[in-house]
UniProtKB/Swiss-Prot annotation:
PROSITE patterns: RIBOSOMAL_S11. This is Small ribosomal subunit protein uS11c. The lineage of its organism: Eukaryota, Viridiplantae, Streptophyta, Embryophyta, Tracheophyta. It is found in: Plastid. It holds the Pfam family Ribosomal_S11. GO terms for cellular component: plastid; ribonucleoprotein complex; ribosome.
Amino acid sequence: MAKSIPRISSRRNGPIGSGKTVRRIPKGVIHVQASFHNTIVAVTDVRGRVVSWSSAGTSGFKGTRRGTPFAAQTAATKAIRTVVDQGMLRAEVLIKGPGLGRDAALRAIRRSGILLTFVRDVTPMPHNGCRPPKKRRV
């Protein structure tokens, strides 16, 4: 008599759903990185694990439109919408970079209904470190 072949569970036969567990996150940190060409918004929990993120490029803006304040506002709204559904009530905001989207992203975060404990500018500033690139001659 032939041996029966053991069944190997496939991806289709596995558990239904994405497998992610929805965690309640009452407090978090919102990181806004605003460069001249793009704005990236990442929402993390207090330990630094990324819960949600978005950028002007993933929000549907391409080319030079990614650096606009409206694109930054859209990216911030998109990143925060998911964490508000997960129950985030309070957040700290860390803003980095010289881009146009700094203020627009902060305005969108304020409008979301999350209580902001503090807003800090963490743009790296050299204490006369590396020599900057030469000036352009146009």
